[in-house]
């Protein structure tokens, strides 16, 4: 193989081309590659952060849902207790009212019974005096009559 001027000229031209590429072409290509690599890394980091944020949000939503269910159960339990308390209060009030009505009715019955007894005593006294008048054939004066009726009523 002969080394001639053409081969040396081509080698020098190639060396100039390589130096030109290293000086002017290679730095922007490397910069573009680094920029692209950085964008990809940032995108992966953002995706990772988004996945963590999503996981945290789901966990937080689950916790809030559990808290809401617990709070709802507590509210329902309080409502049941309050409902039972209202029913018990109503039953107690009804019992007290029934006792009051019963006592009042017994008092009215006792009063009516005493009134009927007094009327009956008066009628029995009048009948007794009337019967005694007929038997004796004489009339007793009104004062004695009233005194006799009262005495008989007291005895009866």
From Swiss-Prot:
Keywords, comma-separated and alphabetical: ATP synthesis, Cell inner membrane, Cell membrane, CF(0), Hydrogen ion transport, Ion transport, Membrane, Transmembrane, Transmembrane helix, Transport
Keyword GTP-binding: no
Chain segments annotated as transmembrane: 12-32
GO function terms (MF aspect): proton-transporting ATP synthase activity, rotational mechanism; proton-transporting ATPase activity, rotational mechanism
Top-level taxon of the source organism: Bacteria
UniProt-annotated location(s): Cell inner membrane
Membrane topology listed for this record: Single-pass membrane protein
HAMAP family for the chain: ATP_synth_b_bprime
Record note on quaternary structure: F-type ATPases have 2 components, F(1) - the catalytic core - and F(0) - the membrane proton channel. F(1) has five subunits: alpha(3), beta(3), gamma(1), delta(1), epsilon(1). F(0) has three main subunits: a(1), b(2) and c(10-14). The alpha and beta chains form an alternating ring which encloses part of the gamma chain. F(1) is attached to F(0) by a central stalk formed by the gamma and epsilon chains, while a peripheral stalk is formed by the delta and b chains.
Homology family: Belongs to the ATPase B chain family.
Record-given protein name: ATP synthase subunit b
